[in-house]
Amino acid sequence: MIEVLTTTDSQKLLHQLNALLEQESRCQPKVCGLRLIESAHDNGLRMTARLRDFEVKDLLSLTQFFGFDTETFSLAVNLLDRFLSKMKVQPKHLGCVGLSCFYLAVKSIEEERNVPLATDLIRISQYRFTVSDLMRMEKIVLEKVCWKVKATTAFQFLQLYYSLLQENLPLERRNSINFERLEAQLKACHCRIIFSKAKPSVLALSIIALEIQAQKCVELTEGIECLQKHSKINGRDLTFWQELVSKCLTEYSSNKCSKPNVQKLKWIVSGRTARQLKHSYYRITHLPTIPEMVP
């Protein structure tokens, strides 16, 4: 499929994909650091996978509350995991670290008119630290990520892979795969630290490949194989991460899974704050329930 794409749009997409693949290994979390977090015991003194996952769910709630793009959330998770995989963060500082990463991502991705004031962000997040605390932590985060805020994320690959597959479909079949569903699935994966150990391209292709299987879009199977080959993704790696994604989505769709809670954010905004906030702050985008997937 990749070899026969001849339209101008397709060539542009392919050029973007090649650029992302070239940059992919830069600005990613240290896998060894993530493993240390995963192996840490929950004694209240050390960062654990559970605490990290809860923090990411809070960032997802904020993303939905403000109506920010998935790209913003994906970048915030990248920044958070890059920082956590380098630094020994005490649990009591995690909220400030997480919100700092989130604010950096918001200012990097969102339009300036949609960027909230730091005071509003702290209040809505229900934290007790000050704007000065947030700004100091922001500087620390920037220093530890070498001032490289922009990073290659799984969301960027998800967009490009999806667009390239769409180019290969007849017009009447282009709605067979829903991009919003893919976004929702990626958000669920971001809420598990294990997926930050996957290469962004592998995670994105795993999500799309599973959805194609679930929707029985056999005409796209060859397209997935071509994208896998072009991206130089090992078949065993793809299968390994597909199985983990499938397990994650199955658990996410069950009642046992703790889902992001946007409702708690809605209720704490006072009348005075509400009058000061922009209308776009109430544009809540709920994360849809993901039906159980068949491995």
UniProtKB/Swiss-Prot annotation:
Entry keywords, A to Z: Cell cycle, Cell division, Cyclin, Mitosis, Nucleus
Molecular function terms, GO-annotated: cyclin-dependent protein serine/threonine kinase regulator activity
Location(s) in or outside the cell: Nucleus
Up-regulation conditions: Activated in breast and prostate cancer cells. Activated by actinomycin-D induced DNA damage.
Entry keyword annotation includes Cell division: yes
Nucleus as UniProt keyword: yes
Cross-referenced CDD domains: CYCLIN_CCNG1 (cd20583)
UniProt note on tissues of expression: High levels in skeletal muscle, ovary, kidney and colon.
InterPro entries membership: Cyclin, Cyclin-like_dom, Cyclin-like_sf, Cyclin_N
Cellular component GO terms held in the UniProt record: cyclin-dependent protein kinase holoenzyme complex; cytoplasm; nucleoplasm; nucleus
Domain of life from the UniProt record: Eukaryota
Record-level GO BP terms: cell division; G1/S transition of mitotic cell cycle; regulation of cyclin-dependent protein serine/threonine kinase activity
Main location: nucleus
Protein family according to the UniProt entry: Belongs to the cyclin family. Cyclin G subfamily.
Function: May play a role in growth regulation. Is associated with G2/M phase arrest in response to DNA damage. May be an intermediate by which p53 mediates its role as an inhibitor of cellular proliferation.
Protein name as annotated: Cyclin-G1
Gene: CCNG1
